[in-house]
Amino acid sequence: RFFIFENVAAFMKTGCTAPDGSVKAIGDVIYKELGEKYIIASRILNFKNYGSNSSRTRTVVIGVNREMAEYVSPIELYPAYVEEKSLRSIIGNMPELEWGEICSSDFYHAFRTYPERMRCWIHDLKEGECAFDNQDELKRPHKIVDGKIVPNIQKNGDKYTRQYWDKVAPCIHTRNDQLASQNTVHPKEDRVFSVRELMKIMTIPDEFKWVNFSLEELNALPEKNKKALLKKEEIKIRQSIGEAVPTNVFFQIAENIKNFMEQEHFTTAIINKTIENYKLEDAENLIKFIQNNPLNLGNASLARIAELTNSKRE
């Protein structure tokens, strides 16, 4: 009855091999192959304004079976616009972590350590500053070869860059365990974001289980066992979070579909009977009926009632 595609902003214009063997834009293929059966809408959204806590611009395509097109448009199923949230509002209350610390009350509030010689590269950075811009060459990312400093190549401006507290969180990449990856440095502390912080940024519920232990069981483990488990599982968890679909965005779409399916959707004959029974030709009765929606009707049915009553008054 419905389908949803999510991909990069240029998804619909990207070339692909069509069923006939030719190269066509993905969007053209979708409309050709599915357009006969589905009403299709495509929108480019920055998820930061649609329920995610990080900035990520994506294409979302929603299709609705034409059998239901009289009652719902795919546009109605998109998540609602919301104001973006700052990183501080999302993770600002998380406890600070010492070097290599695993939070005693939250196993997932921990970060992957890195060689301590690299710490001076980011230690003095203010929000928005990059380690490659440090004046001291020893504080710029480098390696030592035959006793000589060899600077690392700066391929991206957002590597080794301290994030802003009062801006929306950045897009989360798969190698979010590394300082050398994009937008990974905590706004205040000399570390990457913890798994728990990443979960909050990506709207993954706190109760989600990454391993077959409850949080209480994980918190009760001896420190040695905690470190061993993190060593085994942390990279897989982080890579699953990076580039993931923000759960809250698609929860809203699913909720909109669920609400639609639970509503009544009337034919024209039933709508005319409803107008008669509720005396909806009276404007005041119509307004109250739409506001209260006593029959739990879908938007299309309510709009049709308003349309028919207005035409009858004319």
Located regions from the model:
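C-terminal target-recognition/interaction regions appended to catalytic cores
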Residues: 109-314
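Class I S-adenosyl-L-methionine
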Residues: 1-159
